[in-house]
C-alpha cells in the first residue's frame, strides 16, 4: 500500500513538473523577431498588463485585441530604439525628465511612486523594467537632439504671427510676459521639429530591419 501511495505521489509530481516545463516553454516561445533580437510570448503578456495598468483600463473581450495590437507595436518600437541606442553607445539622458515621467505616470493613475511600485509588483511586473523603459525613451530623445540639433530651423515670421495671436488674448502685456510667451512658442516649435526628426529616424530604421512574426 505504501509503495502504491509513493508511486501515485511520484506520478503527480512528475506531471506537475511536466506541466510547469511546458508552460515555461510556451511563455518563452519566440513570437516576433526584430532583426536578431527575439520577443517572447511572456514579453507580450507583460506588455499587455503594463499598458492596461498605465492606461487604467480593464481588459475585456471588446478591447483585448486592440490592447494586444498596441503591445506588439510598443515592443517592436522599444526593441528598435534599444538596438539603435546600443549601436551608437548612448548612455546620457535627462535625469530630471526621468523624475517627471515617474511622477506624472503615478499621478495619471491616482497613485504615488510607492503605490505604482506596489501595483506593478502585485501584477508580477518590475518597477525597474518600467524605469528602464523610460530611460530608453529619454536616451533616444538625447540621441535625436545630438544628431539633428544643427538641422533645426525656425521660421521667424511664423513665430511672430503666433506671438501676436497669443498677445491678443493677454491682458496688460509687458516685456517679461511677452518674452516668456515667445520662449514658450520657440520651445514648442523646436519640440515639433525634433519629433519630426525622431519619427523620420525611426521610420528609416524600421524599414531597414527585418521583422518576423
Model-derived features with residue positions:
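N-terminal targeting signals for Sec/Tat export/insertion, comprising classic cleavable signal peptides
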Residues: 30-63
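Boundary at the C-terminal end of the N-terminal hydrophobic targeting segment
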Residues: 23-25
